[in-house]
Amino acid sequence: MKLENKYIIGCHCMFYEIDMVEEYLNSLRLAMEEIENTENIKIEMMWNMSEYFEQCEAKQSIYSKIEKLERKYNFDSLFYEDDDKPYTMADYRRELNNQCNECDYVIWGESDCLMPRQLFGILEQLMEYSKSNNINRFITTFGIRKMWDESWKVLEHPKFTDKPYYSMDTPEDTKLAESSPWSIRYTMSQEEMDEVNSETKELDVQMIKYPKFDGSGLVISSDLLRTGANIPPAVYMNGDDSAFLDSCRLHMGENYRQYVIKNVLKVHNRNHPNKRNYVKGEDQSKNTHFKRSTRGWYKEFNEVSKGNLNKLYYSQEPFNKKEIQK
């Protein structure tokens, strides 16, 4: 297949995610297998090696692993190595969005995300349809697994939407959450995702006129970003997707458009067992889901960021500019 559009797919990867990120890169490689003009796709990796918040136990080994990935996969590497100033995924995604003038689509990659093989074929069709119908500013999302409340049903894959949701509040629920393929806490493989997607013979494409998405694998038309929609600087880390969602709503109003590819699954492995390795002093016996939440800096940073998120629009409340200490 020859692409008519240009793509940039950017991913921020912390040093402790290095043992997980190849699965994401491999999913992109598989999605590109049938593409004739791969020069139309720019894959960018921002390797965050900063020890501002957490110390790394094996930094040189991680650099070596990055070099191996660079030899195996075709992507551009950027590095953040300042130990005296924090840099987060929200910072990177703001910068990624600003590359909108160089492409037709900006895609938010994520180190624990698997993108579907059908990615480019679907997006090419959508752009053709959109242009013929004068829809130039839009978001595209793929099907997701069972989420925690009814508001997400519009995005859930039909194979999973009627399944039960398991929290991780009790040992029993944690066990079910980690062992049920439809659960967002279950670590799904490329092969399992491919099997689900192989069942789709005809696309179920729905359009919603209000923003609803998580940031993993988010597809944004460059014209939407040219409106100025972005992640506000007041949101430092947590809530970057929610802040961007509100920005899209503010910029587009009643003209907001989002394609939902219901029956093509993308995977967000939030609870991947290799999500947090090489962090000095971290209790490796803990479940991935609970590791970061026990860190004091994380709790503080989370409160600052989410507190600002609630003040973004239609408010005169001052933002919290507090510097988070190491």
Where do the model's predicted regions map?
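Conserved catalytic core of nucleotide-sugar-dependent glycosyltransferases
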Residues: 97, 116-226
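Hydrophobic targeting segments
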Residues: 5-12, 28, 42-47
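Short, well-formed alpha-helical segments that are part of the catalytic scaffolds
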Residues: 17-34, 55-61
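Short beta-strand-to-loop acidic/aromatic patch adjacent to the donor-nucleotide binding site
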Residues: 103-116
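C-terminal catalytic/acceptor-binding lobe
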Residues: 195-326
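Active-site acidic Asp-centered loop
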Residues: 48-50, 109-112, 143
